[in-house]
């Protein structure tokens, strides 16, 4: 019943316009969750007399438990063993399965700063708003955002980052490598990071995804229900948070002789850019400007019959492209 209620919460957009239904759903969730915990407690917890209705086994051996403390120690040791790549992010605002409305607002502000002020120290966040504590614990302390040359940038975990963070980055890299064969759902990536041995909380996943998309900006294509998303923005991330299953990512890398051709195209399209912006052009350095160009054309240009054959074919190919 609890799983069904969570499904309704995630997949019923009509709730956004029905405050009464939202209150009823929250009340039902609270009641069912409390009932579940009480029943689990009666089954699992040793009684005051030291008896237990359960027999506990770990690694094939029975563990005798005579107290609640003993059970807690066992569960703690089991969790440490199973989730051995869980990072120790000390931020109770966002390192949670469900975040509060105020924490969600701070996370939104942080993601907006990540997108708009990536090259600035502390992402241009001044003072001590809640998003600054999120930044310090999740991005700065791990080295995911650090100085790279004259500017700040998103990077792989730093040398001082804990092993768990390095393992998470490798898992994300393996996922992206697999996506080269075809787009993979963002919800699949989130499910991977929630499972053992990582055990990440859902609250931090959008922030980690933002790091990945911004670090691999010219290599990862983002799709919304099969349609290419040319610009990663804060509103897009708000939709990802609500419906990650509607989004997919694909890593796009070109090697060999074709890479030379793509580099030439990229140089032509970025002829007005600075030298820094023209370093190591990638496939998406071409795709994004072309996509933006075609979507911004006046309607009469897209419907006229006066275009040359090659120009018409290019427009049609870009419009109909799914990858």
Regions found by a protein language model. Give the residues of each.
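Extended alpha-helical scaffold and adjacent linker segments that couple domains
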Residues: 1-323
């Amino acid at each position: 019943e609890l799983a069904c209620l969570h499904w309704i919460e995630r997949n019923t957009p009509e709730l956004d316009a029905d405050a009464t239904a939202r209150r009823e759903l929250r009340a039902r969730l609270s009641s069912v969750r409390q009932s579940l915990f009480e029943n689990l407690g009666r089954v699992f917890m040793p009684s005051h007399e030291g008896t237990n209705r359960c027999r506990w086994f770990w690694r094939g051996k029975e563990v005798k438990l005579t107290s609640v403390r003993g059970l807690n120690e066992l569960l703690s040791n089991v969790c440490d063993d199973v989730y051995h790549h869980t990072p120790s992010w000390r931020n109770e605002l966002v390192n949670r399965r469900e975040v509060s409305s105020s924490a969600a607002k701070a996370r939104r502000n942080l993601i907006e700063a990540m997108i708009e002020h990536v090259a600035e120290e502390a992402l241009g966040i001044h003072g001590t708003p809640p998003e600054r504590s999120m930044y310090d614990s999740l991005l700065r302390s791990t080295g995911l955002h650090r100085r790279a040359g004259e500017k700040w940038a998103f990077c792989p975990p730093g040398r001082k980052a804990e092993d768990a963070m390095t393992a998470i980055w490798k898992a994300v890299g393996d996922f992206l490598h697999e996506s080269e064969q075809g787009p993979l759902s963002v919800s699949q990536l989130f499910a991977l990071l929630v499972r053992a041995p990582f055990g990440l909380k859902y609250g931090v996943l959008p922030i980690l995804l933002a790091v990945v998309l911004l670090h691999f900006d010219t290599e990862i294509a983002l799709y919304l229900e099969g349609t290419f998303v040319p610009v990663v923005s804060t509103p897009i991330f708000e939709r990802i948070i609500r419906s990650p299953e509607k989004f997919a990512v694909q890593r796009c890398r070109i090697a060999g002789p074709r890479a030379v051709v793509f580099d030439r195209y990229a140089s032509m399209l970025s002829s007005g850019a600075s030298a820094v912006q023209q370093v190591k052009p990638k496939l998406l350095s071409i795709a994004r400007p072309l996509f933006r160009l075609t979507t911004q054309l006046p309607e009469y240009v897209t419907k006229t019959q006066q275009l040359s054959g090659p120009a018409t074919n290019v427009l049609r190919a870009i419009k109909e492209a799914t990858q």
